[in-house]
Amino acid sequence: MEEREESSSHEHLKEKLRELEEEWTAMKTGKNSSAVSWITVEDALEYVENSPRNLMLSLQHKPKAEMIQEISPLRRKLFHDSDDDDQTKKTTLLSHSSCWSSNVTSSSDTTKAKKKTTIRRFVSVTMVLLLSWVLVVLMNHFDHLSMNTQIITLVPT
């Protein structure tokens, strides 16, 4: 039963490959396609043809410097970098990326913002409580004053 499933999936993959090859030859012979797009598509197909497992195995066994040398021109083409010096090989892959911007907030920035908001909340609650206490004290004080004046005026003669 497993052999039938494997053979049917294998045949399905072969059929897909044939369809892709036919489409590829049709693209190559087409009048509207240019040589530049052919090169780009050929490079893309070269990467697609490698299975993910083979790609991962090759990445595990290659030295890091060799990987950066291979990836660097592709990354430059992707992000339209114009620098061709050796500094890009020594730096990280994200250092020259246009996706990496200064707008990204670090975790320390978010913790500082949280501290500011908690301090602001604390200060505002404290001010409200303090003002309400002052209001209560003033109201009680005025009540006592008014009571005292009434008592003084009500003293018998």
From Swiss-Prot:
Cellular location(s): Nucleus membrane
Membrane-spanning parts: 122-142
Domain of life, source organism: Eukaryota
Gene Ontology cellular component terms for the protein in this record: nuclear envelope; nuclear membrane
Membrane topology designation: Single-pass membrane protein
Keywords annotated in UniProt: Membrane, Nucleus, Transmembrane, Transmembrane helix
Motif (Required for nuclear localization): 154-157
All copies of domain KASH, residue ranges: 104-157
Primary site of residence: nucleus
Domain notes: The KASH domain, which contains a transmembrane domain, mediates the nuclear envelope targeting and is involved in the binding to the SUN proteins.
Subunit structure and binding partners: Interacts with SUN1 and SUN2.
Protein's name according to its UniProt entry: Protein SINE4
Lineage, top ranks: Eukaryota, Viridiplantae, Streptophyta, Embryophyta, Tracheophyta
